[in-house]
Amino acid sequence: MKKFLIGTTLLLIPSFLGAIAEETSRYYLSIGGGIALPNDIDGDSNLGGTNYDHKFSTNLSDNYAVGLGYKLKDWRLEFNYSTGKVQTDKITSNVRSSIVPNLKRDVNSYMAYGYKDFNGESKVTPYFGAGIGIATISTEDQKISVVNAFHYTHAGDDATVLSYGLKAGIDYEIVDNTSIFTEGTYQNFGSYKAEKSGARTVNYDASSQFTILTGIKFNF
């Protein structure tokens, strides 16, 4: 999947640059909000000399995004910033475990997307995009109890990971230079290690989420 995303993005760039000589640039600003459906988070830690696998069950969460783009004919290149909080409500481990507080992640993404618009005669424009960038993930310390007898601290940390995504959406022009859009995004976040002095290191696997956003776009 990662190779496909990188390859697709690289293929979009020459087509985008080739259009520069044919049309004057048009910048745009997009603002959107919606919901994120994150997959459960998997990780592992060593507690008292024993390795334990953990699964954190996630909930729906809010997600917000701002994009600044450059449009040339049917192609667009966009820098996109999005932010959201991933919240969990349960931990499942090899043995009976509990954790306080529940794992929460503050996730901020900084992505570069290439888009292809499928323009027709109507005001409706479907589009597809692929992007790559980085995401920062912040977590707090948690107290974890194993079989209600052994108590440890899982390390919270701030990490920066590689991220890539796929988008598909529909844009509807409401007046000249202004449109509304709805889009779905699949985004993957790389694995990382949360570690801190005096706490147990947690190895988090790569994770992903699907986001549905609705917003408005201004061309200028």
What are these regions (language model features)?
Residues 19-71, 139, 211, 217-219:
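Short glycine/proline- and aromatic-enriched beta-strand/turn motifs that initiate or cap beta-hairpins
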Residues 81-82, 86, 90, 174-220:
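Predominantly the C-terminal beta-signal and adjacent terminal strand-loop region
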Residues 41-50, 88-97, 138-149, 193-200:
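Outer-membrane beta-barrel translocator domains and adjoining extracellular loop/strand segments
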Residues 22, 67-144, 209-220:
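Gram-negative (and chloroplast) outer-membrane scaffold detector with strong preference
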Residues 29-35, 79-83, 128-134, 170, ...:
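Transmembrane beta-barrel strands of outer-membrane/channel proteins
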Residues 1-26:
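Cleavable N-terminal export/targeting peptides
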